[in-house]
Structures are given as C-alpha cells and as structure tokens.
A protein has these predicted regions:
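Cleavable N-terminal export/targeting peptides
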Residues: 1-26, 169-170
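A broad helix-preferring feature
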Residues: 13-19, 106-108, 130
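Generic structural signal for beta-strand residues in well-ordered domains
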Residues: 15, 24, 48-50, 97-101, ...
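Short glycine/proline- and aromatic-enriched beta-strand/turn motifs that initiate or cap beta-hairpins
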Residues: 21-67, 166-170
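Short coil turns and loop connectors of transmembrane beta-barrels in diderm outer membranes
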Residues: 25-27, 39, 53-55, 100-104, ...
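Outer-membrane beta-barrel translocator/channel fold
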Residues: 58-117, 123, 132-133, 141-168
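Charged helix-capping and loop-helix junction motifs
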Residues: 125-127
Length: 170
C-alpha cells in the first residue's frame, strides 16, 4: 500500500512539474488603448517576451491621433478628429519589474521608437509605469501610465493612461 502511494505521489509531482511554469520565458501579444494629454488618442500593438522575475522586452507598433475643434462648427467632427495630426512609430522597450504580488506585478517601462507623421521623421523616448493583473489562462489586464518625449513632433511631450489586455502565445 505504501509503495502504491509513493508511485502515485511521484506521478502527481511529475505531472504538475511538466504542466506548471512560473511565468518565465513566456511570450504575449498585447493591445492597449488610451488617452493622452492634450487631445490625444493612442493605440499600441506589441509583442512582449518575459524573462526571469517578470523582467520583459517589448517590441511595439504605436499609432497616435491628436484631434482639434472644428473651426466652422466649433465641435469635434470627423474631419477634425481623423485628419488633424497623426503619427506612428515602431520601437523597443525594456521593462524591469519593480513590484511583485500574488496576482499582480509592476514594471518600469523604458524605451525608444522611430516613426513618422504625415510630413517628417519622428523619434521618441518612452518612460512610464505598467501594472499587470494576471487572470486565468495566462491572460493579463494592464494599466500603463506613460510619458513620451517626441523628437521633431508637433507635440513634444505626450502623457496619459493606457488600458489593455495581454494574450499568451505559448
């Protein structure tokens, strides 16, 4: 009887060891949408590779729209929203973990990007804080406070909040 329990315990340990992982070396696809000061809307699609202790590298594509009030109707109309100022960028960010909890963790986000608006080249330096909430199945919700320094952009500083979801790839 004791030999049977030992074998059963070993099988259970091996099964849990094979299927369980502590969220290291995992890959995620994330989508975030947010509002930035002043009159900006931000959309970010990114691939994130997480290493040990929740430190991560993020490769991202970012789109930005800055809307204005229409001169003729004094409201925000489709013309003044979609065609006022637009930019896009591609970049990389390193995210070291600074806070860890049971089902959440926080990262400082440090990165750089290159892109364009409709007329010229843009460079960007990105700083911020991202807090992640881990759900079942590896899904994550995140809230990101970001500040972007845009070189040669219409607006030098962009700051705001982005909310999003991360989907596991492996």
């Amino acid at each position: 009887m004791s030999m049977r329990r030992i074998v059963l315990a070993l099988v259970a340990i091996v099964a849990f060891a094979i299927t369980g992982k502590a969220q290291s070396n995992s890959d995620r696809l994330s989508l975030g949408v947010g509002c930035l000061y002043q009159n900006g809307l931000d959309l970010t699609l990114s691939y994130e590779h997480e290493g040990k202790y929740h430190h991560a590298w993020e490769f991202f594509a970012n789109g930005y729209i800055k809307w204005a009030e229409c001169a003729s109707c004094k409201h925000i109309c489709p013309e003044s929203f979609w065609k006022n100022y637009r930019s896009y960028g591609f970049g990389i960010a390193y995210k070291p973990c600074v806070v860890r909890g049971r089902n959440h963790y926080g990262n400082v986000r440090i990165g750089a990007s290159a892109g364009s608006d409709t007329r010229r080249f843009l460079g960007g330096i990105h700083l911020g804080y991202e807090h992640n909430y881990v759900l079942r199945g590896g899904w994550q919700l995140f809230c990101q406070v970001k500040t972007d320094l845009m070189i040669k952009g219409e607006d030098l500083f962009r700051t705001g909040i982005v909310l999003g979801v991360k989907l596991p790839l492996n």
